[in-house]
A protein has these predicted regions:
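Extracellular/lumenal inter-transmembrane loop segments of multi-pass membrane transporters
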Residues: 1-12, 55-67, 74-78, 89-99, ...
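C-terminal transmembrane helical hairpin of 12-TM major facilitator-type secondary transporters
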Residues: 276-326
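Core transmembrane helices of Major Facilitator Superfamily
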Residues: 73-84, 110-111, 315-326
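Central cavity-lining transmembrane alpha-helices of secondary-active solute carriers
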Residues: 17-32, 256-268
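Extracytoplasmic gate region of multi-pass secondary transporters
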Residues: 202-270, 327, 353-359
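Central mid-sequence intracellular linker of multi-pass
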Residues: 94-108, 128-206, 374
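Cytoplasmic membrane-interface "Motif A"-like loop-to-helix N-cap segments
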Residues: 35-47, 274-287, 338
């Protein structure tokens, strides 16, 4: 793609930064809209909207088009994760939320594995006029997302007590007794969830009260820092593997083990966090995992095999992902619906800020995560 668009690695970095900046600024407004109209309405709108832009990436001709589509994608995708967390909080207790969120991120990484196989196939396609196969990949991914968004628009219920509908069945998914059980179990776990209904807007006064809740600030700080160690490797693994001498086709397949390790770590560490009622110490363990691998990448011989670097990079990308655990802490410690609405968005804004920092570690086409001596 870089060659087709006449771009350098620095241009790609700029595009990533644009995406995360617009994503960051869209987080809180998107969450406030979701709280106002309901996540069951807003999430499908987001998905359909960004799927159109994602598909339009198939037609970009230069880096200006790349920058424009990255900006639009950031604006439309921003807030999707907090919106999803808000929606899930209607259904699950605080101790049930982490593992459900881990399933959410498992599906995200599973799509990365599927995309790697698709990329392997599509990148073999190149028209006689020089059209790259990556264009077909973007078009297909946008189409799939759009179809899922359309299904979600008719399938997502507003709450456990509002599952009846034309496409969900006139009697809904649960009987009245089951609905009472579902609502009572959630409210007994966190009575504050009964303070606002699912289509009640957060007023400016409530927004300010949530923002100045200093008990949440340390969690925001965690969001700003904990992902930086492996962000460069995660974002630029394909470019890095190509710089190590692997072909474009093999590069896509060689990223798959990282996603598999990631999924295993995500599920295991999230389960352990609830099994032993421990969360932040697991986060420390994840950082130690990254530190050991970063030291290895720093001290490895310059003439080391490309396969050795590949193993270290894959293990770094697959580091224990405690995002689901920390997000659940944010929701659990919120203490009110307004704070939960705002805090999940602010936490994710900090995560996007950390992505901006991490993505700009690489500045010259050779990733600092693999060749620190540069």
């Amino acid at each position: 793609m870089l060659d087709d668009l006449g771009m350098t690695t620095n241009d790609y970095n700029t595009g990533q930064t644009i995406f995360y900046l617009t994503f960051l600024f869209a987080e809180l407004p998107s969450q406030l809209i979701s709280k106002w109209v309901g996540p069951d309405r807003w999430i499908p709108v987001q998905m359909i909207s960004w799927s159109l832009i994602a598909a339009c990436q198939a037609f970009i001709q230069n880096k200006s088009g790349f920058f424009a589509t990255r900006a639009m994608l950031g604006l439309l995708e921003g807030g999707f994760i907090p919106d999803t967390i808000l929606f899930l909080s209607f259904w699950y207790k605080s101790k049930e939320l982490p593992i459900r969120l881990s399933y959410f991120w498992v599906t995200y990484e599973a799509t990365a594995i599927i995309s790697a196989f698709l990329a392997f196939g599509f990148l073999h396609i190149r028209q006689s006029d020089g059209t790259g196969g990556w264009r077909y990949l973007f078009a297909l991914e946008g189409l799939i997302t759009g179809l899922i968004g359309i299904v979600a628009a008719f399938w997502m219920p507003p709450s456990p007590t509002q599952t009846a509908g034309r496409f969900r069945g006139k009697n809904g998914w649960f009987n009245e007794h089951e609905e009472k059980i579902m609502v009572n179990r959630v409210l007994r776990d966190d009575p504050s969830k009964g303070s606002m209904h699912n289509r009640q807007a957060v007023t400016p006064r409530l927004l300010w009260q949530a923002l100045k809740d200093y008990d949440m600030w340390l969690i925001y700080l965690l969001g700003l820092t904990w992902m930086i160690p492996n962000t460069p490797a995660t974002s630029y693994i394909s470019l890095e593997l190509k710089s190590l001498g692997f072909s474009t086709f093999n590069t896509n397949l060689l990223t798959i083990p990282a996603y598999i390790i990631f999924i295993v770590n995500l599920l295991v560490w999230t389960w352990v966090s609830e099994r032993f009622n421990q969360r932040l110490l697991l986060g420390v363990g994840a950082e130690l995992w990254a530190l050991i691998l970063l030291i290895a990448l720093e001290t490895i011989s310059e003439d080391a095999s490309a396969w050795v670097r590949w193993v270290l990079l894959i293990m770094l990308i697959g580091m224990p992902y405690v995002h689901a655990i920390i997000v659940a802490i944010t929701s659990r410690n919120a203490g009110s619906v307004r704070t939960r609405t705002v805090a999940t968005a602010v936490y994710n804004m900090m995560v996007q800020a950390s992505n901006i920092v991490g993505n700009n570690v690489s500045t010259s086409g050779v990733l600092a995560c693999s060749r620190y001596h540069n």
